[in-house]
Amino acid sequence: MTVPTLYNFTEALQAPDLAFSTLRDCHPRRTATGGVALSRTSRFAEAEIEWQSRKYLLCFPLSTASIFAVEQTAARLRYLRTPLLTEYTILRDEMTYTDDTGTTRTCDVVLHRLPEGRPLSVCAAEFDAESLRSALDKLEAGLSELGFSHNNLKPGNLYVTSDGRLIPVRYHFARFGEGHDAEGFERLRQFVREQGGKGQMLCDAEPSRYTTLPEFPGHLFVGEMSDQLVRVEDETGYGFVDTENRPVIAPQFVWAADFREGRAEVQTAQGMGLID
């Protein structure tokens, strides 16, 4: 089977009126230099597009298994009406491309509507931490009632709406059935404890829970000591210092957890991972 390439996808986005069937009049988001803005997960490359006055993620399969892996989830979502999730549709034979032999072919893509709002990863500081925790509790209960497991929950995969609701996106690993999101929700709660409300001017006299300790000056945030390392946040992101406040891992991460047994979970612009 011939597999389309990322180059084919990029080429199609440059001329959607020629390459797409349903999405002929879509408009991809572009970079400052005029190129198409792309991101990728392990299964799909993604481009944010505007189509019929709404924003979507157009998801291009990176392997022949990618579409197969999401077919059951997409089929269930097609008939599910809930404010907790957004449209996630497989468009069959949507993209036309030319393979290396000069043969014209088509491939499937996934069209995923983005909620109105912004990712939690970039706007948590603008919302009260307690309100975000409450929204997480409601989302967890709601998804459990639906029998829906996202299986890749992280700040970049949750959108905050103008009324403070949380809506998950990117259902590439989602399943209906037994839940596996408990750990993901706990990590999100830790994230909002640390980031929620940091950008607000608080009017109450209660001191902030997170302060810079006297022995670790010069940081926006100082965490607990773990494995002889202290998690800190500076203007450039999260990093780690030793017990003498000397940099061990320079601040560079969007978010980071404390070290446990020699490893720590971190978030970069590309996603979540582990460092040691």
Language model features: what each stretch is:
Residues 157-169:
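Conserved protein kinase catalytic/activation segment
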Residues 144-156, 160:
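Catalytic-loop of the protein kinase fold
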Residues 131-139:
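Conserved alphaE helix
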Residues 200-276:
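Residue-level detector of conserved, function-critical positions
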Residues 42-90:
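ATP-binding glycine-rich loop module of kinase domains
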Residues 167-199:
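C-lobe/activation-segment region of protein kinase-like
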Residues 87-130:
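Conserved structural core of kinase catalytic domains
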